Amino acid sequence: MASNSTKSFLADAGYGEQELDANSALMELDKGLRSGKLGEQCEAVVRFPRLFQKYPFPILINSAFLKLADVFRVGNNFLRLCVLKVTQQSEKHLEKILNVDEFVKRVFSVIHSNDPVARAITLRMLGSLASIIPERKNAHHSIRQSLDSHDNVEVEAAVFAAANFSAQSKDFAVGICNKISEMIQGLATPVDLKLKLIPILQHMHHDALLASSARQLLQQLVTSYPSTKMVIVSLHTFTLLAASSLVDTPKQIQLLLQYLKNDPRKAVKRLAVQDLKLLASKTPHTWSKENIQALCECALHTPYDSLKLGMLSVLSTLSGTIAIKHYFSVVPGNVGSSPRSSDLVKLAQECCYHSNRGIAAHGVRVLTNITVSCQEKDLLSLEQDAVFGLESLLVLCSQDDSPGAQSTVKSALSCMVKLAKGRPHLSRSVVDTLLTQLHSSQDAARILMCHCLAAIAMQLPVLGDGMLGDLVELYKVIGRSATDKQQELLVSLATVIFVASQKALSAEVKAVIKQQLESVSSGWTVYRIARQASRMGNHDMARELYQSLLTQVASEHFYFWLNSLKEFSHAEQCLTGLQEDSFSSALSCIAESLKFYHKGIASLTAASTPLNPLSFQCEFVKLRIDLLQAFSQLICTCNSLKTSPPPAIATTIAMTLGNDLQRCGRISNQMKQSMEEFRSLASRYRDLYQASFDADSATLRNVELQQQSCLLIAHAIEALVLDPESASFQEYGSTGAAHADSEYERRMMSVYSRVLEEVESLNRKYAPVSYMHTACLCNAIIALLKVPLSFQRYFFQKLQSTSIKLALSPSPRSPAEPIAVQNNQQLALKVEGVVQHGSKPGLFRRVQSVCLNVSSTLQSKSGQDYKIPIDSMTNEMEQRVEPHNDYFSTQFLLNFAVLGTHSITVESSVRDANGIVWKTGPRTTMFVKSLEDPYSQQIRLQQQAQQPLQPQPLPQPQPRSAYTRF
């Protein structure tokens, strides 16, 4: 239990381990490089990639690569080969080499060796460095020269280097194109070398003229050399060139279709299908109706199942893109083909019941995509064909436990989810099929079916009640063994039951689940089911499961983690007893919930570690506590209208002060404070949202809903009590119409709509403030709290991990020591950074750019005390940089005209591909001491020395008056 649970909330937390600093680690490796033993030298060389991963900043990487270049220069060929492998593994760090000239100079010196193997390794080394030296003419010359070598190893290395430089340098590509053409067409060039030279032409895409000349050469090769190997290599290079240059892609599709149709060789047909699949995924918009029709005809007439499978794979890829709309579109002047009578539909219908399950899977995928994409009224037969095809495929493959069958089941189930979402009237038959098949399928297929049922029930909650009975009956009979598949099935089936139960679980369902878990389940399975219960809002079930796990963990931190989850579930369970119009019991329920929340936050704090501080979880729970306290305070404020109504002279006071709110008495000030508190909570929820770059979309939506709840109550207070005249309901009107992806979101949206309607109705009918207004506010709070809170995935699991590491230069010797700068000079602050990822980078969103904000403030002032312009005391600058290979760097010029100590704060935030800014941090601070420049100091000292010599002015006599003596 302890080892497995580490995956959930301690994943990817490996950036804080205490190890050697960068210089010490480099010195250790340098000691190995200087060893006289070849084994120790090789061991030191191969450990460099790990060093680059831990300390990815240019100063260390530059020093390390210079040492490796020395080893490459003076070592033997085996050491050179090791250095080459390290360079290729560390490709993303090459641009951090500062002394590129010196590095290349040491490597390039080996090119003049008499040993052809040494020259070959050097050429491969230069090819691996092409990204940082694309325009080095000496490297270009050496590659051209080595292509004419009589040593095969050197020529192959030159071909490798030529391919890499062609991809990076336009000048090299233009210069080498003719030479490659001559070598390919030359009679003296061996065939195997020609086959290696042809792929270089795929990089000739730097401009249209170069791409056109490469296409002409490839066209000649395809025609002149009809052997199978030459045709395959030339056609594939042709395709890659077309995909990269985006020139003549339709012509390439036609050429591939021509070879697919006319060439009798099976290998060529297979290559044509693979390349068509590549172009279908990269450029589906370039496919014409005629291209798809030709591919359908080939698939209908081919006798080979393997080729038919490949062609259907291309068609299934195209059917999910814009190409399918082009195929069925009606051109003006022509009669468009009906989807029911087209060759594509005919082919898909034929293949739906094919004995080859791969062909059948692609056939039903094509039918599903056509059914969902073509929104026509007369597609009833196609819909039925798609449903029947999916049913037969599911029956065929769900009994088979092989990986191929499970892949087919997964494909069929994804089509079912898509069909249920696009055509909701088919969802009932899809669900019935799945429930029927669940009883007789293999465990692996059952797990996938449960995921499919959960996805459909989330989209269409009305189907949940109908499937609940069958699911509970199935839950009673599974789990007879403790195998991994059975444990996974227990979790998946419990998840579907939670989704299908729109409200609280019945006692019978709870008893069935607990009985199964007590018999064969492991602690990890129980934890996963409890986690799903917390996510779906079944907090009473979750509390019991967490309670049962407390004695099964071996770590103190895990114990506190489970205990905190138990307390949070208990706290949310206390809120299920809320009743509308019962305000006193609502206060007691909230107080009871807060008691358990405070216990839980104490346990959660104890569960955190330096490597995993649980910052999101702690902040989310603190906000929930503050929100409950704000709700409680608002209910007390509303109740105070009964215990402390406005005085009789309240209207007179309001008219005297010119403040109409004073008519309501002291409740008006309390309401104003409550509104500000809810707006403050909404702002804090927004900050939590912006700090959660690695969270999944469901978690972010959950945080957003909490923020909207705060804004809703603040708006209701303003509209009902504080400012009913100017309250606007326009911006809140569309809240309920938004598409909801979960039952929790759907219920919250329903509450928002109902509360807004009641507030708007009261706002129009009655003047503030009456018991109806306060009752409306209290009922709004109760309605929000009656929806069980959902603890989403990011609360338990961190699937994506992204962090930024900053390095500032110049850097002080110690963090508290300031850097000295003269006040008449500017400080050039260089900010370097590395974006570090966990095991799944970019799973939810990627870093597009990094925003760096640099600000400075005057901490302590030295020198004369006179008024200083505010602009001279502070610096405020911002830059946006795009990381390249996860590295970025920029500079700021800062002015410190005022003498004294200044603090510089550098804060980073992240901008994703959608332009959203995320406040990920980190925040780094350093100190600068602004010193007076020597010339100004000398002049000031001279002026101070001259001041005592000047006569002091006599004081002016004060005029006497009657008040002087007093």
Swiss-Prot record:
Disordered: annotated span: 941-966
One protein family per Pfam: INTS7_C
Protein origin, superkingdom: Eukaryota
UniProt cross-references to Gene3D superfamilies, sorted A to Z: Leucine-rich Repeat Variant
UniProt GO BP: DNA damage response; RNA polymerase II transcription initiation surveillance; snRNA processing
This protein's GO CC annotations: chromosome; cytoplasm; INTAC complex; integrator complex; nucleus
Keyword Phosphoprotein: yes
Subunit structure: Component of the Integrator complex, composed of core subunits INTS1, INTS2, INTS3, INTS4, INTS5, INTS6, INTS7, INTS8, INTS9/RC74, INTS10, INTS11/CPSF3L, INTS12, INTS13, INTS14 and INTS15. The core complex associates with protein phosphatase 2A subunits PPP2CA and PPP2R1A, to form the Integrator-PP2A (INTAC) complex. Interacts with NABP2.
Descriptive protein name: Integrator complex subunit 7
Protein species of origin: Mus musculus
